[in-house]
A protein has these predicted regions:
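Short terminal alpha-helical segments
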Residues: 2-46
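Short, solvent-exposed, charged loop/turn and helix-capping segments
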Residues: 56-76
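Amphipathic, well-ordered alpha-helical segments in soluble domains
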Residues: 24-27, 53, 57, 81, ...
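Amphipathic alpha-helical binding modules
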Residues: 80-124
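Short, well-structured hydrophobic secondary-structure segments
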Residues: 40-59
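Short intrinsically disordered terminal tails
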Residues: 1-5, 121-124
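Short, charged, amphipathic alpha-helical segments
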Residues: 44-48, 72-79, 98-105
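General structural signal for alpha-helix termini and helix-helix connectors
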Residues: 33-37, 63-70, 87, 91-95
Length: 124
């Protein structure tokens, strides 16, 4: 099993490169659309890319949510989304192709949700 050595970007790197929301959503959409699903050979690469999107998005959303008041609903929702995304990152790939697709789809849903929070918290 391959492990990811992707590190979260530093604050300086985040300031220099904003998230590419369109690319992140396109990658997520590929797994959430009805057909065609990626082949078993492609699935590992697709899942890795989704994980990388989450690694990039979590610190951004976390930082924006942290600027909101502690009792703000948007802050609580964003933090719940971050927790869910981190939990999904810890899931191991299943033994069957269907289980692997289901895991990747969960990652894709987290990517979409993080994109939503990024846009909503940024005011775009």
């Amino acid at each position: 099993m391959a492990t990811s050595t992707t590190r979260p970007p530093t604050g300086e790197e985040r300031d220099q490169r904003p998230l590419d929301i369109q690319a992140m959503r396109a990658g997520a959409h590929r797994l959430l659309a009805e057909d065609p699903k990626p082949s078993v050979e492609e699935l590992g690469t697709v899942a890795l890319r989704l994980r990388e999107h989450i690694v990039l998005a979590v610190p951004e959303v976390e930082e924006m949510a942290g600027r909101l008041p502690h009792d703000d609903t948007r802050r609580a929702c964003a933090r719940a989304c971050i927790g869910e995304a981190r939990m999904r990152m810890r899931l191991k790939p299943g033994a069957t192709p269907a289980a692997r697709i289901a895991r990747a789809q969960r990652l894709a849903r987290s990517v979409n949700a993080l994109c939503d929070h990024y846009e909503n918290l940024d005011g775009s």
